[in-house]
Amino acid sequence: MHDIGKITEGFQNNIKKGKRSNKHPHPLYALPIIKNIEFDYLFDIPIEVFAILSHHTQLYNNLYADYQQYKKGTFLIEEIKEFIKNSKEAYESLGFSKFFEFEDLKIEDIPKDAKPLELHRLRRKYWIEANNYIKSLSFDDKIKIKSIFSFMFSILQLCDDFASLNFSEYAKDREGIFDDVLENPEIYVPTLNIDNPISFILKDYEPYKFQKELYNSKNKFVMLFAPCGRGKTEGALLWALNALKNFKRNKIILAMPTQVTSNAMYDRLVKIFGEENVGLFHGKSFIKLRDSKEIEDEDDLEEIRDENFKGNVFFKPITITTIDHVIYSFVHGFSQADFALGNIQNSVIIFDEVHYYEKYTLEHLLTLFDILRRMDIPHLLMSGTLPNFLMNNLEGYELVVDEEGLNYKPFKLKCSENHLIWKEDDEWKVNENIINEIIENYKKGLSQAIILNTVERAREFYKAVRDKVPAILYHSQFAYKDRVKKEDEIFTLEEMRKSQNKPYVIVATQVIEISLDMSVDVMYSELSPPDALGQRAGRLHRKGKDWRENGKEYKLKIFLPYKHLPYSKELIEKTINHIKFYEKPLDYRDIKDFVDNVYKDYNLSIPSDLKLFFDEAILFGRHWTDISTIDEEGRFFKVRDDKFMKIEVVPQVYFDELGENSLRAEYMAKIPAYLILNEMKNEEGLIHFYPYEKRVGRKTRRYLICSFKYTYEIGFDYKEEEEFEDIL
């Protein structure tokens, strides 16, 4: 029924001529026909009709409101009668009788024409009645409508997309009403069939006790508390594979904190499950997928676009994505959000490192978890510290704890009242004692990480150490392609450490906390809140059991930061007041205790405004471009706090070298917005930035070229303003 609006003279003529039918909106043309057919709808509003209306453009308040642009459609009445008459036969021949009962369709009258003004009035009537009905419902009933509508819509969209894909070839030299277009329907709903998940995931390793508990769990909602490097991901996959069977689902979604962690998890799971079973989506996933394959021609690029689309809507049995994409699925945050949310209804979700997020995002996540529970969507929350302020806001979850791993003390914490780097007379000074210590440690074969809280301090410390020992600098303000290359370089250094005992030195910002699978012997870090310190420590003596092992002493050496930013002054002061009680060999229970003491009075505002935007988008709401950009940078609704807002720029050095080819996403870098805002205030105007416009199709896209010195080694070399010192 969804395409019955195509049975008009104009639309059929355009098909025969190979012309587009933008002025003949067949989903809207279907409305006056469907209105006259007797249906037993699921609810008091016809969500089935809204699925038909939106199967080419996602529902929003003003969908089809610009009716003046459309042409009148003249219905082919006899063909429509024949189509409706054959509905019972189609129902039986396609095997739908196994799933639901259906009687012949009865239509009262078939109109002669679909007139734009009449269509507009009819559409407006449906919208008003549906909105009034939704407003009268409780939140749980709204969730029920959203859940069932999106699930139904995803089935329609899936069938329509693949039928359209196969239709051109099928329809050659054929006339009249067609039979079913798709064969082998099982390929359109791919599933995982793994007989022995434990041996499949763990190979020859014996599962830890907590991994067995996860595998045997029959609960839909689970929290896991386990240290870094203890096999949380493997345990989560065991839970998820069993949950697919226990709760009759067919997809696993892993929601990661960042694009970097998503890429790393994708590489990891492709090796386990195979490329055909694993999808990826985030704002720059197309680049990652493209770079993972050898591209020879346009057909290869089309295959990458198809893979990216499948990740976007959670099509494959396993999809790795960011928490941003999952959240935007619930608020019409991208063009296929309803399709994606429909697939989420049939999924189990794993959330990694849920304690990691700053307050603003964490409030959104806790609001999301409440919606997921009400939708009855199984999910697992993983954390290395699981602080009380988080646990106190989560009810109805089974708690699984890695008791064995929590007893290990993999490092010793030591705190100094000195700085690693500071300013005197507007010049940066570094702690020469630590520089010398790093040199001596390197000679002893020790790998080391030095973590600073701002990009500029990391840059300046790196400059001081790079001529003394081989070192690499890593932060978030590199162009995307350079950041990926740096990650590959760090991965190679880590492999050489493992295989050849070859040491390395990395200077980084707190981006290291979550993004890199690496392990050093000594870590120097500026003081940060205890949850951040715990994350950093996850890259120190990873998988270790005792701080004295292998003839080494593994130490986390903390230094006072030159400035409290990017953290609040109060939070840094609380951390300083408590850290003296933790100068000892630490296990992860100690770290949790440290976190709980510092955050004792930490209050989260729940629900966040995610609930308001979700409520607004039960069926309609805003157009997705009002919610988010195509790269999932928030507009009206933001997943991340823009307190430290960044802008995307193209380094001048790449623009000079590559011209317009440098305007591709992989050459862009994110830098603090205040850099351009401050220059806009100057009398001379912009000094280091200028706009560049490029025509893309019918639109003109504007880019910013940045002339600050940029190199692969350092990134942008600019001076930060202390009141805006930038995170990451």
From Swiss-Prot:
One of its GO terms (cellular component) is cytosol. SUPFAM superfamilies: P-loop containing nucleoside triphosphate hydrolases. It holds the Pfam family DEAD. Residues 434-592 form the Helicase C-terminal domain. InterPro entries: Cas3-like_dom, CRISPR-assoc_Cas3_HD, CRISPR-assoc_Cas3_HD_sf, DEAD/DEAH_box_helicase_dom, DEAD_box_RNA_helicase, Helicase_ATP-bd, Helicase_C-like, Helicase_Cas3_CRISPR-ass_core. GO terms for biological process: defense response to virus. Residues 1-163 form the HD Cas3-type domain. GO terms for molecular function: ATP binding; catalytic activity, acting on DNA; metal ion binding; nuclease activity; nucleic acid binding; RNA helicase activity. PROSITE patterns: HD_CAS3, HELICASE_ATP_BIND_1, HELICASE_CTER. Keywords: Antiviral defense, ATP-binding, Helicase, Hydrolase, Magnesium, Metal-binding, Nuclease, Nucleotide-binding. Mg(2+) binds at residues 3, 55. It comes from the Archaea. CDD domains: Cas3_I (cd09639). Its EC number is 3.1.-.-, 3.6.4.-. CRISPR (clustered regularly interspaced short palindromic repeat), is an adaptive immune system that provides protection against mobile genetic elements (viruses, transposable elements and conjugative plasmids). CRISPR clusters contain sequences complementary to antecedent mobile elements and target invading nucleic acids. CRISPR clusters are transcribed and processed into CRISPR RNA (crRNA). Cas3 plus Cascade participate in CRISPR interference, the third stage of CRISPR immunity. PANTHER family: ATP-DEPENDENT RNA HELICASE RHLE-RELATED (PTHR47959), CRISPR-ASSOCIATED NUCLEASE_HELICASE CAS3-RELATED (PTHR47959:SF16). In the N-terminal section; belongs to the CRISPR-associated nuclease Cas3-HD family. In the central section; belongs to the CRISPR-associated helicase Cas3 family. This is Putative CRISPR-associated nuclease/helicase Cas3. It comes from Methanocaldococcus jannaschii (strain ATCC 43067 / DSM 2661 / JAL-1 / JCM 10045 / NBRC 100440) (Methanococcus jannaschii). The lineage of its organism: Archaea, Methanobacteriati, Methanobacteriota, Methanomada group, Methanococci.
